[in-house]
Structures are given as C-alpha cells and as structure tokens.
C-alpha cells in the first residue's frame, strides 16, 4: 500500500537533532537569521536587476533566476524547521511533506542545470565577446532558463512518484530535518535497492554532468583570460567569473559529499548537516557573494537607493 493510500491526513515526526536538545535554540537563531538575510539579499538582486536598465543583460537575467530558486529553496524548508525547533511536537503533515519533497528536488535539480547555463554565458562573454549579443539573444536566454526549470521539475515529478509509491507499513518517524528522498526511503518496509540505484544515477546526472560542463567552460575561459594583454583587462574578466565559481564550489561541493563520499561512522550526521548547508546556507551566501564581489550590482543598488530618496523628496 502506498503512502497516499495509507494516510492522506496523517503526520510525520521530523527528528532533526532532537537527541541533542541543547542545539535547538542556537540552530533556531542561525536558521532565522539565514532566512531573513536570504530573503533580503535575493529580493535585492531581483529588484535591482529588474529596475536598473544597465543590468538588463543575460548574466543578470540568469542571476535573477538563481535568486528566485534560492528564495523558493529556503522558503520550502526553513519555516517548518523553525516551527519544529521551538515546538515539543516536531511534526509535518503528509501534504506538507509531499510539497517539501517535491520542491526540494525540483529546485535543486533546476539549480544544477542553471549553473552550467550561467557558465556558458560567461564563456561566450569572454571567449566570443564580438559575437556575444548575437549568440546570447533574448530568445535563447528565455529558452535556456525555461529548459532549466522544466528539467528540474520534471525530474522532481519522477523521483517524487518513485518515492511516494513505496509502502511504509506504519513507519512515520523521519530521521532528518526535512522530507528528503534518502530519509524517506528508510521508512519503506520493502527492498529499496532499485530506488537507491535510481537516486544515485540521478545524482550523477545532475551533479557530475553539469560540473563537467562548468569545468570545461572555465578551462576555455582561463585560457582566454591569460591571453589578455592588460592586467586591468585580466582582472575585470576574472572578476566576472570568480563569484560564479565560488557559488559553484559551494553548491556542488556540499551536494557531492552527500552522495559520493563513502559511508563512515559520521555519515548519519553528515547526511543531515550537508543538505542544511546547500539548502539554507548556500542560498544565503549566493547574493552576498554576487553583491560584495560585483561592482555593477553595488553601483546599481546605490542608484536605486538614490532614486527612492529623490522620489520621496
């Protein structure tokens, strides 16, 4: 009997770190702070990119998509986590668990596809600067963004169905902070070897394949930067890519450590903490990285502030 047939209105217990209650208040403060900073930082990028004509370029169009992903990413997990950290009953409804599972998978896969798209944009800008406006035209940008979202959500539909159709035989205690596939597979009372193999295949496809494309793009970018004669030109070219490289390292580095590092005595806690990093900390750091390391964004934000104050006066 599937999850849906067993309990549509039931609840699931999210253990989190309930065996270490002294961690709950510090984690509540950290997650609440991260949530506020993430909301403000990503909304800032979305508004500035939309309102400032100088940022109406493919690079900032894709950055806006990344900010939307990060906003949704953190919103589908953190509010429920904050409630559970301050509650005696650490539960999530069946419907809430399904939504959280679906969105977490969809947004993670979408970001996996979008990051190599952003590296392709940087590749064209630096390696084919004279043809940039011809290659990265508006229609192509819209198509690339749409494909990223479609692939991400399509993958989520498939994995969610495969996970939710498994019988759980009355098991309802999830040893995690959130409803994630590996944690949910442990609730099943049947052999899940095939599901684990499918999850591994999907992880390889959505992590190693995009990462290989990104590294290939940056190999060509690095070669092109080294050919630039002026130090100022090299610095400017490197500056446009360094923020994206940091974001890529944070996202793929932590995600890969979950699925590809061999099991260890600390694997249980690692599987809990790493999703928190790429699902909460990374969305908070992304706008900070792009804002603090990007002169165009900082200048655009200053112009926006001036416009707001001038309009009030």
From Swiss-Prot:
Ranges of the Extracellular topological domain: 1-27, 79-97, 165-200, 266-271
Cited SUPFAM superfamilies: Family A G protein-coupled receptor-like
Transmembrane segments: 28-48, 58-78, 98-118, 144-164, 201-221, 245-265, 272-292
Keywords from the UniProt entry: Cell membrane, Disulfide bond, G-protein coupled receptor, Glycoprotein, Membrane, Olfaction, Receptor, Sensory transduction, Transducer, Transmembrane, Transmembrane helix
Taxonomic superkingdom: Eukaryota
GO cellular component labels: membrane; plasma membrane
Membrane topology, Cytoplasmic segments: 49-57, 119-143, 222-244, 293-313
Compartment(s) of residence: Cell membrane
UniProt keyword annotation of Ribonucleoprotein present: no
GO biological processes: G protein-coupled receptor signaling pathway; sensory perception of smell
Cystines in this chain: 97-189
Parts forming coiled coils: none
Glycan-bearing residues: 5
Family per record: Belongs to the G-protein coupled receptor 1 family.
General function of this protein: Odorant receptor.
Designated name of the protein: Olfactory receptor 2B6
Organism of origin: Mus musculus (Mouse)
């Amino acid at each position: 009997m599937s999850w849906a047939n067993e309990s549509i209105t039931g609840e699931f217990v999210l253990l989190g770190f309930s065996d270490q209650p002294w961690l709950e208040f510090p984690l509540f403060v950290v997650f609440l702070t991260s949530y506020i900073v993430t909301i403000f930082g990503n909304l800032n990028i979305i508004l500035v990119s939309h309102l400032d004509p100088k940022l109406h370029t493919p690079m900032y169009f894709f950055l806006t998509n990344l900010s939307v992903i990060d906003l949704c990413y953190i919103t589908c997990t953190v509010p429920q986590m904050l409630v559970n950290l301050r509650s005696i009953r650490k539960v999530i409804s069946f419907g809430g668990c399904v939504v959280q599972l679906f969105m977490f998978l969809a947004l993670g896969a979408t970001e996996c596809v979008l990051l190599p798209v952003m590296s392709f944009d940087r590749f064209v800008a630096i390696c084919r600067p004279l043809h940039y406006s011809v290659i990265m035209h508006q229609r192509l940008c819209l198509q690339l963004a749409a494909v990223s979202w479609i692939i991400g959500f399509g993958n989520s539909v498939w994995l969610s169905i495969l996970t939710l159709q498994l019988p759980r035989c009355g098991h309802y205690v999830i040893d995690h902070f959130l409803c994630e596939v590996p944690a949910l597979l442990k609730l099943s009372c049947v052999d899940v070897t095939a599901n684990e193999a499918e999850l591994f295949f999907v992880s390889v496809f959505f992590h190693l394949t995009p990462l290989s494309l990104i590294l290939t793009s940056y190999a060509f970018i690095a070669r092109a930067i080294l050919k630039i004669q002026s130090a100022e030109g090299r610095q400017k070219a490197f500056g446009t890519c360094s923020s994206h490289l940091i974001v890529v390292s944070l996202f793929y580095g932590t995600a890969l450590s979950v699925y590809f590092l061999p099991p260890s005595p600390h694997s249980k806690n690692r599987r809990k903490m790493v999703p928190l990093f790429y699902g909460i900390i990374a969305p908070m750091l992304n706008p900070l990285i792009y804002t603090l390391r990007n002169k165009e964004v900082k200048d655009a934000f200053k112009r926006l502030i001036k416009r707001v104050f001038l309009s009030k006066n």
